[in-house]
Structures are given as structure tokens and as C-alpha cells.
Amino acid sequence: MNWRAVLRLAAFALLVLAIAPPQWVLLRLHRGPHARLLPRAFHRAACRIFGLRVQASGAPSQGRTVFAANHLSHLDVMVLGSLLDASFVAKDEIDGWPVLGWLTRLQQTVFVSRDPRAARAVTAALREALASGRSLVLFPEGTSSDGRDVLPFKSSAFVLFGEPGMQDVCLQPVTVELLAVAGRDSGEGFDRDLYAYHGDASLGPHLLRFLGSRGARVGVRFHPPIEVPKDFDRKALAQLVRERVVSGLAPSDPGAALAPAPAHAASCRAAPAAITAR
């Protein structure tokens, strides 16, 4: 562990000590919009500490929204959390992890089981979170990748939109792209796995290695929201959202900037989609 990693860990510990106690109190008193302000401030500060520079384009939807993004790393949570007042959807085993599980509970993460038999309970938990006024961030790939491409999206991630009361909930595709790492944006020495956490990598060593580096620059593109009709094909919807996400990736140059996108606040009615049932 080098000096940079030590300093970053110390700064992160101080950040947790500064923000976690008041957030714990807020959640005991009120779980409304005010309880979502500190997590966003926490993620912004954590990005600075970790050397994560976020380059955003487009604009997140207003109101209740399900943001569907590709997934490269556990660090994606800090990146997206610095831009969104939203709760993340995560596998339930994270809830039991030391420290990390506690921190994710403080930001009102929705924990879900991967057991197919728990599908109804998962849908109910997501509906409950949205009904409380929260927006959600989910990773429909169901795992992380190195970010060169986007894995197939699981159609089960979108069954929620067939439930009653979802008509006014936005669905917005989001592209996460690694633009630079350790001061390099392409070519020799571009170590994608310094940021990307996938395969058989271990969380602790991967995080320490990143903390000892010069950090990374990550692009986030908010695509136009998709209007989901009442009668829709779940697999077609998953494919459409994935195509939107893929369209935000640079085809060959890992250092290429994301194409510019409108900066105005997005509307759920901005992009009707042809995803009717087949």
C-alpha cells in the first residue's frame, strides 16, 4: 500500500465520520427528500478523495425515475451517486458486508434477492421504494464487465413496468464509460482493470490498487427517457434500453469523449418507444 492509498483511506474515514452520524439521525426522523441530500454530498466528496473525475452529458429525468446503467465497477456507485438523488438496487448479500453494508443502508439501498422464487418480493420492494418518492438506479446486466461492451440486459429487471401505478415513472438509459485511468486515456499503458471490477477480482486488493493510482476519468451520459406503454414486451424493452446504453460508448477509442447531449432537464415523454407486445 503506497502513501496515496493511505492518505485516501484516512480522508475517506474522516468523511464517513462526518456524514454517517447525521444521515443515521435523518433516517430515524424522516425518510423524505432531505434524507437523500447527504448521500449525494457524500458521493461527490468520495469521488474527489478517490481521484474520480466525472464527465457528465445529458440530464437526468425529473421526478420518479428508474435509471438503467451498464456496470463496470463498485466505483460506479460513487460516480452515479454524485450526480443523482436516487437509491441503488443491489444484491442482498451486500447488506451483510462489514462497513460497506452499513453505508449502503444509510443511502437507502434497496436490497434484492437473485433467487427466482423471490421475484414477486423483489418487485414489491422496488414498487414500495418508488411509491415513497424515491428514484432508483439499477444495473440490468446483473454483474459488472470491463466496459468494452455491454452485457445482455436481463429482462426480469424491467418486469416492474408492468405493475399498476408505474405510468408516471420514467425509465432512463444511462451509459457509464471509462475515459481515462491513471492519467492515460488510450494506447499503451491503459489499464482498464484498474477501474473495472469484474471476473474473479477480489474487492479489497482491487480497491487498494485503485486508491494507490492517479485515479480515473469516467463519462456518464443520460439518454432521452423511454416512455413505456401499458402493453409492452419485456425482452424488447430490455433490448431497447441496452441499445441506447451501447450507443453512448465510443466504438474503438477508450479515451474518446462522450458525444454532447442536450443539457435541459429531461421529460418522461421525450422519447416514445416502439416496444408493444409481440
What are the language-model segments listed below?
Residues 1-55, 102-106:
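A transmembrane-helix-recognition feature enriched in membrane-embedded lipid enzymes
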Residues 64-69, 134-140, 169:
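Generic beta-sheet signal
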